[in-house]
């Protein structure tokens, strides 16, 4: 269902699609060393242990996520599987020299469904800023429309029947080394300097094709 490249059933920690210092000064190498190198790695390693010897061993991440969501009554492997998926999707949502305003069909759909890019920007930022505690904010595609959603902890739009297009991680470990408690500044920096609209556009095309 996702438009990103899926983490394989081997549950290998895939490196971000950029050098760990490539997003500076907007996201520091130190943040990536801890966030990707420690937190993301722990989700992958813990997932391997959880599914070893079970019927989930060897299954793709998306299968595990759907199988263990259990209508919100989460089964043990859900959090690590979803967090492993979410983080890979997050890294692929960014690029050096990113941000700014999208173009083409993506921009047209944002303007159609939110009345303007600026309204989308405000709604996405608000969702990310107001997610209480740990979680994520997303741009998603569902029923031929774009929508902004926020999810707690490890939950993602895959289990809500939507195609994720863009996400920002608002767990404190995502921004605390660079921004401390200034989550809104982190969100603004992400949107203006880091988002890969090319990745979002590619995911949109894949989502449209999958739902046709």
From Swiss-Prot:
GO BP field: circadian rhythm; response to cadmium ion; response to copper ion; response to light intensity; response to ozone
Catalytic reactions on record: 2 superoxide + 2 H(+) = H2O2 + O2
Assembly and interaction partners: Homodimer. Interacts with cpn20/cpn21.
Modified residues (N-acetylalanine): 2
Family: Belongs to the iron/manganese superoxide dismutase family.
Signal sequence coordinates: none
Source species, domain of life: Eukaryota
Function of the protein: Destroys superoxide anion radicals which are normally produced within the cells and which are toxic to biological systems.
Places the protein is found: Cell membrane; Plastid, Chloroplast membrane; Plastid, Chloroplast stroma
Induction and repression of expression: Circadian-regulation. Down-regulated upon photosynthetically active radiation (PAR) (e.g. light fluence) increase and in response to ozone fumigation.
Regulation: Activated by cpn20/cpn21.
Keyword field contains Membrane: yes
GO MF term list: copper ion binding; protein domain specific binding; superoxide dismutase activity
Cofactor notes: Binds 1 Fe cation per subunit.
Any Pfam family the entry gives: Sod_Fe_C
SUPFAM superfamilies: Fe,Mn superoxide dismutase (SOD), C-terminal domain, Fe,Mn superoxide dismutase (SOD), N-terminal domain
Cofactor(s) essential for the protein: Fe cation
Gene this chain is encoded by: FSD1
Protein name: Superoxide dismutase [Fe] 1, chloroplastic
EC number: 1.15.1.1
One GO CC term on file: mitochondrion
Annotated positions binding Fe cation: 35, 87, 169, 173
Keyword annotations: Acetylation, Cell membrane, Chloroplast, Iron, Membrane, Metal-binding, Oxidoreductase, Plastid, Transit peptide
Keyword Ribonucleoprotein: no
């Amino acid at each position: 269902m996702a438009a990103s490249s899926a983490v394989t059933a081997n549950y290998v920690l895939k490196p971000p699609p950029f050098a760990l210092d490539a997003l500076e000064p907007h996201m520091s190498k130190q943040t990536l060393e801890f966030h990707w190198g420690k937190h993301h790695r722990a989700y992958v390693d813990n997932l391997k242990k959880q599914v070893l010897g079970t019927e989930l061993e060897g299954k793709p991440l998306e299968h595990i996520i759907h199988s263990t969501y259990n209508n919100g009554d989460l089964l043990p492997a859900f959090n690590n599987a979803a967090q492993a998926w979410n983080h890979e999707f997050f890294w692929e949502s960014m690029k050096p020299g990113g941000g700014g305003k999208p173009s083409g069909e993506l921009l047209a759909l944002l303007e159609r469904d939110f009345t303007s890019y600026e309204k989308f920007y405000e709604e996405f930022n608000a969702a990310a800023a107001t997610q209480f505690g740990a979680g994520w904010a997303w741009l998603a595609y569902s029923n031929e429309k774009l929508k902004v959603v926020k999810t707690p902890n490890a939950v993602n739009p895959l289990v809500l029947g939507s195609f994720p297009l863009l996400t920002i991680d608002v767990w404190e470990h995502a921004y605390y080394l660079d921004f401390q408690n200034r989550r809104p500044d982190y969100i603004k920096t992400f949107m203006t300097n880091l988002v890969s609209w090319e990745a979002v556009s590619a995911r949109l095309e894949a989502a449209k094709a999958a739902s046709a």
